[in-house]
């Protein structure tokens, strides 16, 4: 969703995390929204989401990040999970070649179910485990270039490029929404920012709270 309000934040953007189970999606979520990392995190069951409010080019943006289980038995939630998403972080594990080989399957699913204008970034996670690397950074870069995606290698453990990944996605979404708003205003004087998808009202969660396991 790309939804505009006038009070606590200017925009609410829904971003989905996708990729195989075990690639570190939940720790990316907790690192970005709560600055936490849990070494013994268990596989996600169903869907979780968390929020964080931050500044993007002078605007207050509330990022609503959704995390889903990677296991096939949870694929029934697919259409609802993608509905209204304006950004996606597609994650693979640099130490597990199979998770990289499955990236294109995840891309097909995303493009089948999500809005055609969705902003997608590919992230090679667990860059702190370079000694166990099974996917080169060049391979990741080549695939992302072929598919027209942004690309970074990340480490939720060391907090490497997590902030940059989400800032990049949110900034690109903001640019798209701003262009649509400008076009709408030119077409219809006084038109407001067009909504995308379904707006879901959720309770605000402070992104600055540090609690639970392995707080930093």
Curated annotation (Swiss-Prot):
The keyword Nucleotide-binding applies. One of its GO terms (molecular function) is GTP binding. A motif (Effector region) lies at residues 41-49. PROSITE patterns: RAB (PS51419). InterPro entries: P-loop_NTPase (IPR027417), Rab_GTPases_membrane_traffic (IPR050209), Small_GTP-bd (IPR005225), Small_GTPase (IPR001806). Its main location: membrane. It is found in: Cell membrane. Keywords: Cell membrane, GTP-binding, Lipoprotein, Membrane, Nucleotide-binding, Prenylation. GTP binds at residues 19-26, 67-71, 125-128. GO terms for cellular component: plasma membrane. Transmembrane segments: none annotated. It is a lipid-anchor. Belongs to the small GTPase superfamily. Rab family. This is Ras-related protein Rab11C. It comes from Lotus japonicus (Lotus corniculatus var. japonicus). The lineage of its organism: Eukaryota, Viridiplantae, Streptophyta, Embryophyta, Tracheophyta.
């Amino acid at each position: 969703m790309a939804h505009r309000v006038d009070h606590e934040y200017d925009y609410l953007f829904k971003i989905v995390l996708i990729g195989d189970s075990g690639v570190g999606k939940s720790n990316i979520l907790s690192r970005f929204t709560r600055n936490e990392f849990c070494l013994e995190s268990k596989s996600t069951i169903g869907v979780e989401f968390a929020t964080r409010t931050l500044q993007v080019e002078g605007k207050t943006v509330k990022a609503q990040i959704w995390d889903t289980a990677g296991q096939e038995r949870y694929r029934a939630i697919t259409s609802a999970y993608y509905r209204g998403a304006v950004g996606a972080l597609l994650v693979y594990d640099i130490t597990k070649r199979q998770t990289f080989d499955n990236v294109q399957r995840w891309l097909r699913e995303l493009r089948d179910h999500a809005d055609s204008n969705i902003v997608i970034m590919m992230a090679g996670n667990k860059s702190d485990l370079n000694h166990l690397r099974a996917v080169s950074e060049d391979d990741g870069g080549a695939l992302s270039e072929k598919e027209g995606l942004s690309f970074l290698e990340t480490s939720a453990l060391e907090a490497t490029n997590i902030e940059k990944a989400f800032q990049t996605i949110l900034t690109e979404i903001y640019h798209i929404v701003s262009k649509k708003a400008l076009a709408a205003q030119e077409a219809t004087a006084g038109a407001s920012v067009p909504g995308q998808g379904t707006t879901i009202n959720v309770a605000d969660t402070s992104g600055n709270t540090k609690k639970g396991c392995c707080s930093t």
